[in-house]
């Protein structure tokens, strides 16, 4: 049954505090890998490994107006950025974190992704804090507007050994980190039940959700096997806006 392999993410409104970078803060980043439609680089939130050797970092994309890159489950078309960190030294790289995507609808195709700019955060763990950490990546990505163009970007940066202070990029990495969906318990919400419905109009996934904090524009992103597509939900909220029923069309 579909409900067995779908992984739901119910997303509430995200807020973050505006943080000001110090005028004296350094910047740890790779050079930009530049293309006509998009540029990409690596960025780090600290200018040294510190005692624990753990540094939050990210892949930063900057797109020309109208161009986009894709979320980890892109929808009806496209593929997400695919980094390969095999060339890194003294750096264990965590899986990417994925901020809340935007929905795009073109010619009946529903896709999920990012426009303008985005940082996909990850964590660097150095095995030896007495040595520099070199983060090297080959990033394959697809950027689309009326047409889609694939690129392979080569980028690398060095995070020095020693005490680490926040870089000039720490606040922007933190901003996108705050947009990454939290677990249901951390967000104080619960999907109490989910089921499938068949009708003359097609197949739907329906989910009931409750939240301790009133919902504001809730959305539901579903992930499933290649070949299945999931549209934007039709949402019905209770009067207090602390419970919601979301009905998602399934195609494919």
Description of each model-found segment:
Residues 1-5:
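Positively charged n-region of N-terminal signal peptides that target proteins for export
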Residues 7-18:
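Bacterial N-terminal signal peptides
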Residues 23-252:
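Extracellular/lumen-exposed scaffold segments
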């Amino acid at each position: 049954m579909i409900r067995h392999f779908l992984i739901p993410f119910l997303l509430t409104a995200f807020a973050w505090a505006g943080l000001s970078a110090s005028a004296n803060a350094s910047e740890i980043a790779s050079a930009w890998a530049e293309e006509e439609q998009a540029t990409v680089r690596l960025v780090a939130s600290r200018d040294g490994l510190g005692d624990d050797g753990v540094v939050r970092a990210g892949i930063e994309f900057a797109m020309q107006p109208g161009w986009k890159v894709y979320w980890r489950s892109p929808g009806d078309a496209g593929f997400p950025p695919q980094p390969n960190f095999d060339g890194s030294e003294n750096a264990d790289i965590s899986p990417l974190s994925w901020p809340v995507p935007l929905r795009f609808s073109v010619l009946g195709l529903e896709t999920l992704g990012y426009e303008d700019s985005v940082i996909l955060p990850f964590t660097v763990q150095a095995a030896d804090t007495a040595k520099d950490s070199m983060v090297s990546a080959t990033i394959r990505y697809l950027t689309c507007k009326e047409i889609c163009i694939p690129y392979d970007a080569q980028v690398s940066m060095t995070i020095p050994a020693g005490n680490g202070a926040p870089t000039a990029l720490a606040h922007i990495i933190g901003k996108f980190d705050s947009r990454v969906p939290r677990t249901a318990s951390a967000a104080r919400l619960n999907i109490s039940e989910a089921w499938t419905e068949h009708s003359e109009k097609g197949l739907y996934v329906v989910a009931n959700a409750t939240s301790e904090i009133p919902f504001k524009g809730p959305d539901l992103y579903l992930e499933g096997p290649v070949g299945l597509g999931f549209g934007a939900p039709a949402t019905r909220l209770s009067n207090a806006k602390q419970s919601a029923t979301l009905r998602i069309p399934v195609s494919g």
